[in-house]
């Protein structure tokens, strides 16, 4: 079952990247309006924030394999319709693109927590850490090759062909999902009465350590993870006129992420999960500071480390919550945890304003320092709470 799930995931994520690049290019070249591009991407992302909790509740109630087939089949259907429309008509209304982006956003909002909830149940032969790490590895591989494939398609053919490639990826992904079946987790009667939001509030009341990790993640997603938006500005400032530097930098970042997912399961045998999360977040902040040096070798090394440590932080975050949640609450809790990604666009906006006011080099320094400070503050808060809990338990015993 593992091979079918990960093969399907690879094709789904590959299709997502090819389609995303193709859609952005289609909107820009067809309508020549940057506002339309912003609206389309807003419609694609906002359902994730609005529907994730509801989607997580669904993942806890029904056969996850069937839900996965439904979501990917629906993605194939709407993408195939868009493909037919763009091939059939020389111009289509922007409203059609907005409707498509919204539908894909809704399906993504359901599929993301669902996929995370499946990982611990894949196989007895691999641990949750290995499953999450390999899942992240696939995401990073697709992030590396997806845009490149889309670029080749756009150069040789045109944007509608990227939608065709996307639909083909989805279709094969659906076929690979056919053997996937998972037992529905039995929800206790007293737990089934509670609304999803109450379950999440009660979870964070009980798990103080998890609460600190989640808050840390929300903040550093805004301060540090917006680097992808600002990196082209930095490379153009430090190395003006050398556009290839940005492409190489993004490749190095992806390589760092791939290395991180491969070695993390081994590293976690020697370093505790929580300590690993805070350590990788701290080193991520240090790496952000390193990219401001006007030295191409140092920049590429630091970019690689950014990819490595940021992926370590994200993966240990996901693994921690996978290992510290009840089976029948996994979908609900993970749906909230995955919403930390919603802080990246907000952080990008804030850091873009900082770049206009203070300059791009100082902005990266601000990003690095703020990420380091946030990590250290919440690490010591978490440590203090842990010591208090140990003292109280010792007093009781």
Swiss-Prot record:
Gene3D superfamilies: MFS general substrate transporter like domains (1.20.1250.20). It is found in: Cell membrane. The keyword Calcium does not apply. PROSITE patterns: MFS (PS50850). One of its GO terms (biological process) is response to antibiotic. GO terms for molecular function: efflux transmembrane transporter activity. This is Staphyloferrin A transporter. Pfam families: MFS_3. Disruption phenotype: Deletion of the gene impacts growth in iron-depleted media. Mutant accumulates staphyloferrin A in the cytoplasm. Does not affect staphyloferrin B levels. Involved in staphyloferrin A secretion. The lineage of its organism: Bacteria, Bacillati, Bacillota, Bacilli, Bacillales. It comes from Staphylococcus aureus (strain NCTC 8325 / PS 47). One of its GO terms (cellular component) is plasma membrane. It is a multi-pass membrane protein. Its main location: membrane.
